[in-house]
Amino acid sequence: TTQDSYYAEADRFGKDGDFITAPEISQLFGEVLAAFQAWLWELSGSPDANEMMIFEAGPGRGTLFEDMHRSWRQICPQMAAAPVTFLETSPYLRSVLTSRFSGLDIHLAKTADNLPEVPLFGVANEFFDALAIRQAIKRDKGWVWRAIGLDIDQFVFCDGPALHPDEMRQHKLAADAPADSVAEFSPASEAVLARLARHVARFGGGVLICDYGKVNRQDDSLQAVRTHKAVPVLDMPGLSDISHLVDFAALARCAEAQGARLVGPVEQGRFLSELGIK
């Protein structure tokens, strides 16, 4: 449940948490993203503040948004004055955001459904890599879903049900794939991306996705980090940051199915460099 989740009651970010993201390293990251969004705003016809929305998926403590908002106050006052929607389910982080941005027009959402019907200018920084995935693994008799079982008092990975032929076709899994090949899918990521892509295709704007990812690779990318060190994925679940590499090709197909287009991906270093960070 949300109340029992990893982010529910603790601050997981920064040097005293489990991991550090780009906004905790330098405010330049947020400033560059703000400039990119301001450019996108101009390309979209420069809508007034009350005719658009700012959106962030997985804002954490609001560090990135604060840096972006500070920049917008200088370079794009319309974006600084626009209403903001944070997609955040953690009760703890929702409380932090409400307090931190009490002077702004902030809306907290648990899903990307029922957003205002206006152009959306959004960012998702290290958001999709934290959403749930499913894994399939190739065995001698075919593809099976990877499951989690209990060995005495320890969680362990085990083989689950075999994939139906329709599932193999849906996920483009080869029957002659090498033994122990692993394929990953994230229905949760595709559901959020589809909703945002549908919104952008209909009302305009765009969403900048910054994440660790891959393109059309089939391997096991599931990992866990606790206090800045790699740990076994099933070691003390709920107390470690579990993530995976985002499949940008899958997100691109999902966006295109909704009438939008995913541009990229490009390496983050190149993206930031071309926007001014050296």
Regions found by a protein language model. Give the residues of each.
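Class I S-adenosyl-L-methionine
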Residues: 116-278
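Rossmann-like AdoMet
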Residues: 1-57, 61-119, 270-278
